[in-house]
Amino acid sequence: MSTHPQIDQQVTFLYTHNLNASTEFYEQKLGLELWLDQGTCRIYTVSGSGYLGLCQASEKSTPPTDKQSSVIFTLVTQQVDEWFEYLKERDIEFEKSPTLNEKYNIYHCFFRDPDGYLIEIQRFETNDKKKDITK
């Protein structure tokens, strides 16, 4: 197995039709902290070295217009139920309440952002410390 050069950070970029609405959703509803404002693209700290970039769509870049997007933005936490209650208090409508997925051994829930991107709050249900990426 070869060793690759170090990766310092990771950013997932999502296009939005309305940067102001997405900014309000991710800042006010999810409570993410703005890390870098580039005008038409805003980058938020998710955790440690993980970031989310929201970019205003241009005529050449089209975000999904329906709920069939293949992107899932997953936030991993031990506190799935706490996040569920926190977001319900902020009037977030869930597509799926917290449930155990036995196939993948995860506990999770789903909702969508203003552009229709699917967001998952998830906990790995494993006793194997090696696989528990939240610790």
Regions found by a protein language model. Give the residues of each.
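A generic local structural motif
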Residues: M1, L30, E59-T62, K96
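Vicinal oxygen chelate
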Residues: M1-P5, D8-H17, T45-V46, P63-K135, ...
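Terminal peptide-recognition signature
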Residues: Y26
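Short secondary-structure junctions
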Residues: G31-D37, F94-S97
